[in-house]
């Protein structure tokens, strides 16, 4: 889980390349154990907040994506230029109770 914030003026400019190029580029890396990515967005006062959720099967898979220190955030320079601030480190959690979609009950919208 990783948090970032930008201005209202930059929010669409930040989100658009994520949806059209960055997320596809991550998938094309064909990292063993990578299961997908989700992007959440909401207004947060004068800013727009984003939460990126990436799904991996193991810490080894996360390291294959991020490098030896799996908590260092991977933020492309072009994205950094559009952000007001962002977490320097990402947080990793184990899924303890899968969501309803994991049981096939609801589908997440395609990004």
Question: Residue locations for each model-derived region?
Answer:
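Residue-level signal for secondary-structure boundary sites
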Residues: 10, 60-62, 98
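Short, well-ordered beta-strand segments in beta-rich or mixed alpha/beta enzyme
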Residues: 1-5, 36-70
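Glycine-rich beta-strand-turn "strand-cap" elements at beta-sheet edges
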Residues: 35-49, 74-111
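Short secondary-structure boundary micro-motifs
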Residues: 10-11, 21-26, 37-39, 48
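Short, surface-exposed ligand-recognition loops at beta-strand->loop->(often short) alpha-helix junctions
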Residues: 5-18
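An amphipathic, aromatic/His-enriched active-site/gating alpha helix that lines ligand/cofactor pockets
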Residues: 20-32, 55-92
